[in-house]
Amino acid sequence: MIMDLQFFSHHKGGGSTANGRNSAGRRLGTKAADGSVVTAGSILYRQRGTHINPGENVGRGNDDTLFALVDGVVKFERLGRDKRKVSVYPVAE
């Protein structure tokens, strides 16, 4: 005699998966291209950590966002062998 017992009181319902979710992108990266003209306070680069360092006339926010301190032209430059910086140079009028 073969008995086929199924105890359904402890089975999980088959409806959703445990890993079926993803977080939205954080919109990080370059916000002002090299050579573009920006005003003071403009966001130049959004980042987590100091992927790019602040150069001349560039400030760094609490979340490591780089922003222009003066009106001028954006310039991305090398800082040594393996680092980069972004600077803003005022335009002579």
From Swiss-Prot:
UniProt similarity note: Belongs to the bacterial ribosomal protein bL27 family.
Organism: Limosilactobacillus fermentum (strain NBRC 3956 / LMG 18251)
PROSITE patterns associated with the record: RIBOSOMAL_L27
Source superkingdom: Bacteria
Biological process annotations from GO: translation
Pfam families reported for this sequence: Ribosomal_L27
Transmembrane domains' residue ranges: none
GO cellular component: cytosolic large ribosomal subunit
Keyword Transmembrane annotated: no
Record key words, sorted: Ribonucleoprotein, Ribosomal protein
Keyword set includes Ribosomal protein: yes
GO molecular function terms noted in the UniProt entry: structural constituent of ribosome
Propeptide: 1-8
Protein's name in the database: Large ribosomal subunit protein bL27
PTM entry text: The N-terminus is cleaved by ribosomal processing cysteine protease Prp.
UniProt-annotated stretches for the region Disordered: 8-29
Gene name for this UniProt entry: rpmA
